[in-house]
Amino acid sequence: MQSQTNPNPSLPDDLILSCVARVSRLYYPALSLVSKSFRSLIASPELYKTRSLLDRTESCLYILYCTSNTWHEGPRLRVKLMSCTACVLDEKIYVSGRCKDGDSMTFQVFDTNTQTWDPLSVPCSETKHDFHYKIVRFDGKLHLVSYKGVDAYNSKEGRWDLVTPSIEHNKYLYDCYRNIGNVWYTIVKGDISTSVWWYHSEEREWRDLKGMVGLPKFPIDACLRMVDYGGKMAVLWDDYLPGRRKKMIWCAEIALERRGSLEIWGKVEWFAHVLTVPRQYEFVKVLAATL
């Protein structure tokens, strides 16, 4: 009697990993439904390390249609970017980033109505050595930050205007920003102390957030993130444990009170260590969720 052969012999894990790494990330949600092993593979860091080694990294735009609750891949950027920053203004997505050659930057605009990308000229020509590519949206305009100053983009007139010269714009260069109650806040780390600032839109200047008694000094290399927590300010930051093999995530909750038109006070209600993670983790974004 002839023995029956297995019609679906298993493939080596390394071969499966190599094959999946060559597939667009758009199809990963579907692949994760195939089996538990595929689901584990899609979630594994080894997959993304392999994609990087094979030069299969992607700069993709995924669009969620809320009516059908489905994801679709949008048109790709016309240039490959090493890193980027983005924001939304007037139903358009503005993306600024460093090109893959590492020596130039680009500005691209995605029109959500026409589903197309278009280049946008920038008011500076800095290279990777002196350009801090950050875009921030407030006062109804797009603000482009460079070491030479801050330029605001008027989308209706298609014009850039210098709003802050380089000597006055240091508050824009920090990564921790959040709009809380229609007011922009940022945190400035220093060797001696940490300060929180808010932007007075009418006076067009940054002002010190008063109070803040009990706010701990953040490590100079800490990654900071801020979020609107029901009208209060929640600040999260990290700090290494001894040995630097793990990090502690800390959180502080700060109540905000406006006193007149020129002062805002902050009261630190509590802060505590809330989580321990491996040192390899990175803060990406902080969201306040209501369950």
Curated annotation (Swiss-Prot):
Superkingdom of the organism of origin: Eukaryota
Cleaved signal peptide residues: none
Gene3D superfamilies per UniProt: Kelch-type beta propeller
Chain positions of Kelch repeats: 46-91, 92-140, 142-187, 189-232
Keyword set, alphabetical order: Kelch repeat, Repeat
Domain F-box as annotated: residue spans: 5-51
One Pfam family this sequence matches: Kelch_FKB95
Name of the featured protein: F-box/kelch-repeat protein At5g38670
